[in-house]
Amino acid sequence: MRLKAIKTGLRNALPLLYRFNPAGLRFALRVVIAALIAYGLARLLALPFGYWTVITAVIVMQGNIGGSLKAARERFIGTALGAGLGFLVTLIPVGPDYQWVRLALAIGASAYVVSLDARFRVAPITAIITLIVPQPGVSALAAALDRVVEILIGGAIGVLVALTVLPERAHRSLVKRIAALLRQLSGMLAIDMKGLHEPRDDAALSELIETSRDLIKTSVTLAEESSGERAARLTGGTAPDALVRTARRVRVNLIMIARATREPWPPEADRQLGAIFDNLGRSVAAHLSAQADALEAGRAIAPADGWEESFQRFEEGMAAFRANKENDALPTELMSRIFSLAFAVRQVKADLADLDDRIGEFAGTPRG
């Protein structure tokens, strides 16, 4: 039993040993190639602190081209800022016993800049290295310039390798994430609609909600990186931010539906509205899956036949439900859930129409 527990622990701690990940292997290859090129160039040019070139090439190498461009830009700007501040404080006349004053001023100034913009977070580290690390006889200005040049070389190597060695574009990764998100939302809706008639699987629903939240977070980062690719003219098409925002709105409304379907309806409500919402739920779930397929295929999408009819039947059913005076005896909490569900359904329809437009804008955009 103990051996089995150890094996399970290793499996949980080292999942890569139990799962083949082609994207991970491609990334590892890019990192190795970038590091070896940087190492060889540092040796060839006899750079004084050549290890910074290698480290930068590795740090800049991200999962996609957009991420590498962003990392290279931020590291170079932060390094230049920190090196500049490190050099400027050396101009302050202090005695040998008060070198800490320069160090404190450089760290404080660079840390303040980081508080304004986290993209410059390497600035304090560079300022410290500029003031402390230089070899005897090497001026602070020379140390600062050396570090900036080496970071620039390492960043350039990382970007070039990202562009040429099994390149992965943030745009393509974003499309995959949004498609996966839409399929997760389709599964969420299926569980929600089932919850109108019988106790639902809340554990499975919670897992889908958590997974969809992670996909949204990843998509926000990928959208930023994809925008960097567009700025560098590596990817065409429209800006991806609107696609992510619209997908997020759809998710929020589906969570509202999940809250409104947390308990089965009593027989009198289920008899009047159950079949209507079942039909509507199947239509929306199918459309979410179709949107995912269209996004991955790079084509526009139109609602399936019967789409508008299912919403028309929904509106007619809700109107009949409101007009039925016998429903005034239903519990207030139940009525609140029913009308909250109806509101969320209308919002979903509007957001899905917007999402159709966003997917249409992405149609034909090169996937990289």
Model-derived regions, located:
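A transmembrane helix-and-boundary motif of multi-pass membrane transporters/channels
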Residues: 1-214, 357
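Membrane-helix exit/interface motif
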Residues: 88-92, 227, 258-262
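Amphipathic alpha-helical coiled-coil segments and their boundaries
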Residues: 174, 205, 236-239, 243, ...
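Short, charged/polar, low-complexity loop and linker segments
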Residues: 194-200, 225-235, 323-335
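Short, surface-exposed loop/turn segments at secondary-structure junctions
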Residues: 199-206, 230-237, 267-271
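Alpha-helical segments in soluble extracytoplasmic regions
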Residues: 203, 208-219, 275-285, 289
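Oxyanion-binding "anion nests"
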Residues: 215-256
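Soluble C-terminal extramembrane regulatory/interaction domains of multi-pass membrane proteins
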Residues: 246-368
